Amino acid sequence: MLIAKYGNGSIEQVEEFERKYGINLDEYYRKFLIKYNGGETPNTIFRKGKVSETVRYLYGLNVEQSIEKNMIYFDWRKNNSIPIGADNFGNYFSIGISENNNGIVYFCDHERGFKNIKISDTFQGFVEATHSEMISDFAKSTVEEREARLIANGKEHNITDGLRNLWRKEYEKYKDIFQEEVMK
């Protein structure tokens, strides 16, 4: 799995989070939070058996896409799990936090009341069952570079203001993104 991490976490952040909510996180997941503190995972798919889901984000601590912010919408006490990420459609991935399910990863479909559907016995297994594609160089090219490419290919008639706006948004989103392989 490739991730554009939110920055390094710290053992202090993780321990403070665990104390605040009275939970103990799986050791591998703790190491993940310390090393990456979550991040964006564009072009990432989790596949295991017949299950196939996009993975858009893995949440971190004290960042925009945070575990705590998403706990507000997710009945984590009832589910004995906390939200750790999301797919492209607003569904959650969660990780077990009780003695009986610690470290188990679930898919939580919002159309099914966020019911826990087990997809991996461990967070490490979840990471290993994902596949990511690198963000293409085209996605990182400027509007001007894209226009020049279409004109060179005789397709200038396809260029519209709407397309330029789409390109501009994509460029701004991906121009500085750095993806790295998540530890296994």
Predicted regions and their residues:
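Protein C-terminal end segments and domain termini
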Residues: L150, G154-T160
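A surface-exposed partner-binding patch
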Residues: M1-Y92, N158-K184
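Long, low-complexity, intrinsically disordered segments enriched in glycines and aromatic residues
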Residues: G39-A152
